């Protein structure tokens, strides 16, 4: 693994996310595009960011794939079947809802986040699939994980936390999905193009070069198919123009302290 280049900041995830009140991120911009008021409430801490099991699985996968087994084991614990405490009266393992099991789990986890055996198997299976995919493993064979970039675009302070920066290949983003065949549709539905353009624009400001963007996508269920996707130059340029417009709107919202929902006027459904 290469040394992190000077302009790229090595920063804990907690510190990065705590700075969302001061720096606009790609996810913050996507929230703003959907609803400026929702973005503002999240940014100010008045509305908590929702987390889900899928998010937790994705975070665990990022740790294992991008930071390695040692870091994964420092942060995660899974109670393997057959290691649970036994109830002497019944001769069977304590149920997961019992105090005896909870106390045992806490003593074994030692502050680490707990993954169920099935979730652990899922994360390891996805990791192995990524490692055995030629294109994905090549992109991840050199570079640095979770590097932070900060700069100013159109008067707005922005930051990104790249999943992986490969100095020869570009920016690599790691994603999970239910069905790999749906990624093209999800790319549009979840504004991944905005995310890719935002990352590229910030990197160009900080590093002085236009970097290709790759999405490495892995299915959560066996067979854990893996695909590597990139965005053609014409499409990415279109998304870059959108990002510029949205950041300009964002700057105006900041200046006026105006955060609409986008549904202030009457909307027509169907034809005239």
Tell where the protein language model's regions lie, with residue ranges.
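Metal-dependent nuclease catalytic cores that hydrolyze phosphodiester bonds in DNA/RNA
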Residues: 1-159, 264-270
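Metal-dependent nuclease catalytic regions and adjoining charged, substrate-binding loops involved
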Residues: 6-8, 185-190, 198-272
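Short acidic (Asp/Glu) and glycine-rich catalytic loops that position anionic groups and cofactors
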Residues: 39-43, 176-180, 221-225
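Short histidine-centered catalytic/ligand-binding loop motif
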Residues: 47-50, 108-115, 181-191, 232-234
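Hydrophobic (often cysteine-bearing) scaffold residues that line and stabilize catalytic clefts
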Residues: 53, 57, 195, 239
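Hydrophobic/aromatic-lined pockets within catalytic cores
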Residues: 65-70, 153, 176-179, 204-207, ...
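Secondary-structure boundary elements
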Residues: 135-141, 166-171, 204-211
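Non-catalytic protein-protein interaction segments used by genome-maintenance enzymes to assemble
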Residues: 149-193
């Amino acid at each position: 693994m290469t040394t992190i280049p000077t302009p790229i900041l090595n920063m804990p995830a907690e510190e990065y996310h705590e700075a969302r009140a001061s720096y606009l991120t790609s996810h913050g911009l996507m929230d703003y595009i959907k609803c400026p008021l929702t973005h503002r409430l999240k940014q100010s801490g008045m509305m908590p960011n929702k987390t889900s099991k899928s998010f937790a699985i994705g975070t665990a996968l990022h740790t294992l794939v991008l930071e390695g087994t040692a870091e994964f084991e420092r942060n995660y614990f899974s109670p393997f079947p057959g290691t649970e405490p036994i109830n002497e009266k019944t001769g069977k393992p304590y149920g997961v809802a019992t105090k005896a099991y909870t106390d045992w789990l806490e003593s074994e986890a030692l502050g680490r986040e707990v993954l169920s055996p099935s979730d652990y198997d899922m994360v390891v299976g996805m990791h192995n699939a990524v490692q055995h995919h030629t294109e994905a493993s090549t992109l991840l064979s050199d570079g640095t994980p979770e590097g932070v970039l900060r700069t100013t675009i159109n008067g707005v302070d922005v930051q990104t936390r790249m999943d992986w920066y490969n100095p020869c290949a570009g920016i690599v983003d790691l994603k999970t999905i239910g069905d790999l065949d749906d990624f093209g549709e999800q790319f549009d539905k979840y504004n991944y193009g905005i995310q890719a353009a935002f990352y590229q624009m910030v990197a160009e400001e900080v590093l002085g070069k236009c970097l290709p963007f790759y999405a490495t996508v892995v299915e959560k269920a066996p067979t854990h198919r893996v695909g590597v996707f990139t965005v053609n130059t014409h499409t990415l340029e279109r998304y870059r123009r959108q990002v510029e417009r949205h950041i300009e709107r964002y700057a105006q919202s900041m200046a006026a302290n105006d955060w609409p929902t986008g549904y202030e006027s009457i909307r027509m459904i169907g034809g005239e």
